[in-house]
């Protein structure tokens, strides 16, 4: 996957750092500098500097004694700040717990880039467990929430 092309007024280093964060967020296993550089067709020295900066800020963590990296605690904190400050989240969360107390699993999701991004799941005590971890993204056609969003969209 080539690095994202930056547009007018965008900062290439910031764009590349975001690309690295997205890659590591989507990957279950930690990745090394050379592998990341290869995926973006970038010099390893450039990727190394970006990773070092992201790691120093807590957005990436080195996996044990390896030379591989994964998402760090600071990325979690930034994402959590979004949810905590969301008026939608604050308004809907009590209703999700009401649903769960009535044996219905409740989901909060938003439409982003023609996908559903889940912000919260409150699991009921029912026999069937359907979960979407916060931050996960699904295609609109593959979930009931996505289909409900599609039904309300204009052609």
Go through the PLM ranges and name each one.
Residues 65-155:
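Amphipathic alpha-helical effector-binding/dimerization core
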Residues 1-85:
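N-terminal helix-turn-helix
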């Amino acid at each position: 996957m080539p690095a994202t092309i930056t547009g007018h007024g965008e900062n290439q280093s910031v764009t590349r750092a975001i690309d690295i964060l997205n890659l590591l967020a989507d990957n279950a296993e930690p990745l090394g500098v050379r592998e990341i550089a290869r995926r973006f067709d970038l010099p390893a020295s450039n990727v190394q500097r970006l990773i070092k900066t992201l790691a120093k800020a807590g957005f990436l963590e080195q996996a044990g004694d390896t030379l591989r990296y994964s998402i760090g605690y600071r990325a979690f904190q930034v994402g959590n700040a979004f949810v905590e400050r969301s008026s939608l989240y604050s308004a809907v969360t009590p209703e999700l717990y009401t649903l769960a107390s009535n044996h219905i699993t409740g989901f909060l999701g938003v439409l982003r880039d023609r996908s559903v991004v889940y912000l919260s799941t409150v699991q009921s005590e029912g026999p069937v467990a359907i979960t979407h971890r916060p931050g996960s993204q699904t295609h609109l056609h593959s979930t009931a929430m996505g289909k409900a969003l599609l039904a309300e969209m204009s052609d």
